[in-house]
Amino acid sequence: MITIDFEIDRPRNVSMHLFDIRGRKIRTIFEDQTFQSGHFQEKWYGKNDRGIQVSNGVYMVQFISDKKRIERKITFIK
C-alpha cells in the first residue's frame, strides 16, 4: 500500500490518476472531485482500474486542478 499525501490551498475540483512508466493510465483515484482547503491522504493498494494487482515498479501520480498539473514518481513494491 502507498499513501499519497497532498495539500489543497483553497476549495477546488481535483483529479488524481496513476500512470505506468510507459505513460498508460492504470488507475483513476478520483475524477473532478471537490475538496476544501487542507491536507489529505489517499491510499493506493497497487490495483489498476480493473482490480488487478500491478507489478512492482515506478509509477507516476498526476494531480490536476483548475489549469495546474503536477506529476510525481512513486515506487510500488508488494
Sequence positions of predicted segments:
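Glycine-centered coil/turn sites that cap beta-strands in beta-rich domains
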Residues: 1-18, 44
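C-terminal tail/sorting-segment detector
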Residues: 4-5, 52-78
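Intrinsically disordered, low-complexity regions of eukaryotic proteins
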Residues: 7-9, 22, 73
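Glycine-centered tight-turn motifs at strand-turn-strand junctions
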Residues: 11, 25-54, 65-70
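Short, glycine-anchored, charge-dense loop/turn motifs used at functional sites
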Residues: 19-26, 59
